[in-house]
Amino acid sequence: MGTTLFSPEQIAALSAPLDRAKVQTRSQAGRSLAYLEGWQAIAEANRIFGFDGWQRETVAVQCVAERERTLGSSNRAGWGVPHTARVRIRDREVIREGSGAGHGIDADLGQAHESAIKEAETDAMKRALITFGNPFGLALYDKQQRQVSGNGR
């Protein structure tokens, strides 16, 4: 076996089950989806790697489209703007990348772009972090969620 870049404490934290209290759910296309919020993923990275032990870098952001649309029940004029992003996570010598998408909807075109970019970057960051293990949501990909502990809130 080779040497590891992580301390025994970090390996234990990365191998531990995901705490169900940190998991959120939402309904999408008639299904219930479990996920970690972006701030929770950042908090876990800070806890496991240290506040100064990891870096997040946006490698690319791209606007996919820009469409005028109506907003809400009032049918106000607005914009729908999807973006994609690629983010790189670096913990010392370990580098992971993730891709994500975001969709901004707002009456103001600039606000729609800002919202889409933030959502795409957060999605990409979470996808990069998930490759480190359960504390970042990897356990949620198992339909039985065998590596998710606790009863939730």
Task: State the predicted function of each range.
Residues 4-9, 36, 41-152:
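Positively charged, aromatic-enriched nucleic acid-contacting surfaces
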Residues 1-42:
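N-terminal, Lys/Arg- and Ser/Thr-rich interaction peptides
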